[in-house]
């Protein structure tokens, strides 16, 4: 059994014609669309030329008719096609035909197909030849993310018998297909690594171990790493991290990961600097303000923001982004004990702001506040932070749509990019009047309001108090989207999703390109 993080990605190759040999065990994934005939619904192959002969296409479509296939979105069928050298054909429905396809539609279709592969270790696909922007990379991302599995803690008796998807061959004639395919593989591998971290149970991923794994992952791609232990945190005045972590026998950490990408830029002096901050609560009982027992086990995911930040900064180094990226990741375990902070305690955050802790279950904002102040000391141009911040996010937006708060212009930029990459972040306001709800009679701020309304926005207003005025800032609340408690869908498995790794990395790419 292995419990180390770091996803072993399938190999990815690009071909301009159907391989003729050595693919007898492979599955060919072919997209199909509905015919649009209401009285006689059927399915036809969506992308074939120049990879499939007309008689092969006819053979596939005949098999689909025999199965009463309709080409509906996410519908899959397995066919034997003797004229092809592959073991079988797997068709995946895209719904109605389009002139151009949204990348996330193809990403989802690839994920659906990958989840239907069962024991197949090698796939070939014509999905990437469909018209649309970003289709090749989306195809690879969907296949890798859809085939993701986490079995590190299963015994030999219950572990899956197959090795999982190990080889992907993308059929595509575009000149830059290989570059785009490898980019998609790198992004998906980073997301899968974040998933591995989140899926690792808190018995094995506590703050010191989390810091160790972050260090190992980061050093493998050449990042500078600093790990600050509990003694140094206390001495430096990180009151939020220490306060949240003091109830646990497993002390907190703060990790700093630095990608010095400006030296890769054509003009290093003009290269932007981006700070990333992610909440790393390795397990959240709620502390003295304890959570209900029924769903508490899902709080293994309360470090999803930190996992995504670690995955993002390591991906920035791996793909050599020409900007500086500095990640500040606070890590703590929120436990009830004789040493835990109490409702009514006052702590002093890093930087000097005092906070009255009215609810120990609103702990994420306390460790984030410390990290935000430290991150702003680096004088970044932009700050992106993410966390499973509030249950109110799921009330407002559900379990699939992150809430994006922050500086108006940058918030909108982050949300638009999130929607483009398929993580569907939605911009949320931060009304100034909500600050009145955070007034304390004994400290500078209270950590919660006395209202039951606008919980996500109140948390965002709290965090805004710690962001330097000169910094463009966005917070991505992924309380629901970071962890899927329902059934798998598209390229999203049950359990950790890796959201918002793709959003943050796409924002970094956009900043590297456009400033």
Swiss-Prot record:
It is an enzyme of class 3 (hydrolase). It holds the Pfam family Peptidase_M17_N. Keywords: Aminopeptidase, Cytoplasm, Hydrolase, Manganese, Metal-binding, Protease. GO terms for cellular component: cytoplasm; peptidoglycan-based cell wall; plasma membrane. Disulfide bonds: none annotated. It is found in: Cytoplasm. NCBIfam families: PRK00913.1-2. PANTHER family: CYTOSOL AMINOPEPTIDASE, LEUCINE AMINOPEPTIDASE-RELATED. This is Probable cytosol aminopeptidase.
């Amino acid at each position: 059994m292995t419990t180390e993080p770091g996803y072993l990605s399938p190999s990815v190759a690009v071909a301009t014609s159907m391989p003729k040999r050595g693919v007898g065990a492979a599955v060919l994934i072919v997209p199909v669309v509905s015919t649009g005939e209401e009285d006689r619904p059927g399915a036809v192959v969506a992308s074939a030329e120049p990879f499939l002969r007309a008689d092969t296409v006819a053979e596939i479509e005949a098999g689909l008719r025999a199965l009463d296939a309709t080409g509906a979105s996410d519908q899959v069928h397995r066919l034997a096609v003797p004229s092809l050298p592959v073991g079988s054909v797997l068709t995946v429905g895209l719904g109605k035909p389009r002139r151009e396809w949204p990348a996330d539609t193809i990403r989802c279709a690839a994920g659906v197909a990958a989840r239907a592969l069962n024991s197949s270790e090698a796939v070939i696909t014509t999905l990437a030849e469909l018209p649309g922007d970003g289709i090749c990379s989306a195809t690879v991302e969907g296949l890798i993310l859809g085939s993701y599995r986490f079995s590190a803690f299963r015994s030999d008796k219950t572990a899956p018998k197959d090795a999982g998807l190990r080889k992907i061959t993308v059929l595509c004639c575009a000149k830059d297909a290989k570059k785009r395919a490898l980019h998609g593989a790198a992004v998906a591998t980073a997301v899968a690594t974040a998933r591995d971290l989140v899926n690792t149970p808190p018995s094995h991923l506590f703050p010191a171990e989390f810091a160790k794994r972050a260090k190992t992952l980061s050093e493998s791609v050449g990042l500078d790493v600093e790990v600050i232990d509990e003694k140094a945190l206390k001495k430096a005045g990180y009151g939020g991290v220490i306060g949240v972590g003091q109830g646990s026998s497993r002390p907190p950490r703060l990790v700093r990961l630095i990608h010095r990408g400006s030296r890769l830029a054509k003009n290093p002096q003009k290269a932007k600097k981006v700070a990333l901050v992610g909440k790393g609560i390795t397990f959240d009982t709620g502390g003295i303000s304890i959570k209900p027992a029924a769903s508490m086990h899902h709080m293994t995911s309360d470090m999803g923001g930190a996992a995504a930040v670690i995955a993002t900064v390591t991906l920035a180094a791996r793909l050599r982004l020409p900007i500086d990226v500095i990640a500040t990741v606070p890590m703590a375990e929120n436990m009830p004990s004789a040493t835990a902070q109490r409702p009514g305690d006052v702590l002093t955050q890093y930087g000097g702001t005092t906070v009255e802790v009215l609810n120990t279950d609103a702990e994420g904002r306390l460790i984030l506040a410390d990290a935000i102040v430290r991150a702003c000391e680096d004088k970044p141009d932009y700050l992106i932070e993410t966390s499973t911040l509030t249950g109110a996010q799921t009330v407002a937006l559900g379990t699939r749509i992150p809430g994006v708060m922050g500086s108006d212009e940058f918030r909108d930029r982050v949300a638009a990019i999130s929607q483009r990459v398929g993580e569907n972040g939605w911009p949320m306001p931060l009304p100034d009047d909500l600050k009145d709800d955070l007034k304390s009679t004994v400290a500078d701020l209270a950590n919660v309001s006395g209202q039951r309304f606008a919980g996500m926005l109140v948390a965002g207003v709290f965090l805004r108090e710690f962001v330097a005025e000169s910094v463009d800032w966005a917070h991505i609340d992924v309380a629901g989207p970071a962890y899927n408690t329902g059934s798998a869908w598209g390229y999203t498995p049950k359990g950790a999703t890796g959201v918002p790794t793709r959003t943050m990395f796409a924002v970094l790419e956009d900043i590297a390109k456009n400033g």
